[in-house]
Amino acid sequence: MVLSRLDFPSDFIFGSGTSASQVEGAALEDGKTSTAFEGFLTRMSGNDLSKGVEGYYKYKEDVQLMVQTGLDAYRFSISWSRLIPGGKGPVNPKGLQYYNNFIDELIKNGIQPHVTLLHFDIPDTLMTAYNGLKGQEFVEDFTAFADVCFKEFGDRVLYWTTVNEANNFASLTLDEGNFMPSTEPYIRGHNIILAHASAVKLYREKYKKTQNGFIGLNLYASWYFPETDDEQDSIAAQRAIDFTIGWIMQPLIYGEYPETLKKQVGERLPTFTKEESTFVKNSFDFIGVNCYVGTAVKDDPDSCNSKNKTIITDMSAKLSPKGELGGAYMKGLLEYFKRDYGNPPIYIQENGYWTPRELGVNDASRIEYHTASLASMHDAMKNGANVKGYFQWSFLDLLEVFKYSYGLYHVDLEDPTRERRPKASANWYAEFLKGCATSNGNAKVETPL
């Protein structure tokens, strides 16, 4: 298939993105406090987070690179611990100034800001006070944080995402990235859903009329398919969908968890009161989707009997991530949202391909990956999927959980200047966004997941 930007609707948004903890650096400067996610990134990447890639100081340079690339929009997150260092209470003037300056710089240069409120980085003060997501206080504190953001930035920011990868955030630990045990992921997920709905209610009641913005939630969403033609693998694939996507989406659409979760998890799964069910239903204007790979699923009926229960043992399935995305995977995922959830507006908020850092700027495999992804997404859109935008991940090489890079622009973390250099993929994306055609078959790439 040969595609250009001209094959997409005129109002379709093309962008790229990063997150605060992975791009800003200045980890404990100008009043900012620590977060568990930043400690996790430091351990897993082996890099010094305090300097990072220096987005905090190089934001004007980075915005000019966005202009050169031709981005419509840029997705980034606001560091809760930079804006409100105590997690609650006084706003940090220097943090407020930084985000105001950054947003103004984007808009001055014709780049639309898309803001994520929470990208895994809960302030350590709140983790210490009530173990973060496990405490019901999280709902109140997150809503107060969102209120500050809406008040201070909402006159210029029209697109808000409450929580990044709500399902992964609920289920994964920040020690070695393992799955949370027993009841923990379900309690965390429950509180995330309630906190999200609370922030949406606040925005709609207090700010929507004057700011006219849109607000949604983000999910990590692989497309799960049976590993074999065996009927049990097909049933297991649907369970995997229910345990990852349906876990969050069904409450937002129907006010209830999927029947699969109720059956498999039993009393360990929290329940919504009648009032909460009404509260969370329809609490979004769009859904953000982070999609990287397809995942083959094999039935594993014995795993649910494990004494060491996790979300994976509960779903009674073995998952095998696959890197081929040029075929049906993104298409299948988007058509699932269309079929099962009433075709909500979707933004692909992360779609990226890892390469070893030492590869430098020669990343032809990334071009192949993104070309295939765009073709798969375009196929879904031709079939009626309501996709509104596509954000490549990531704009720059960042601090990542694995020692790989996803960026359009190379950043050498050993170079004290943190120089940005365009990769082949940056030049490709810029040409695509100018309307030049790109074509690709069914790309096959490897994945570290």
Curated annotation (Swiss-Prot):
Keyword annotations of the record: Cytoplasm, Glycosyltransferase, Transferase
Entry GO CC: cytoplasm
Location of the protein in the cell: Cytoplasm
Record GO terms (molecular function): beta-glucosidase activity; hydrolase activity, acting on glycosyl bonds
Stored SUPFAM superfamilies: (Trans)glycosidases (SSF51445)
Chief localisation class: cytoplasm
Function of the protein: Component of the oleanane-type triterpene saponins (e.g. saponarioside A and saponarioside B) biosynthetic pathway, leading to the production of natural products with detergent properties used as traditional sources of soap.
This protein's name: Glycosyl hydrolase-like protein 1
Species assigned in the record: Saponaria officinalis
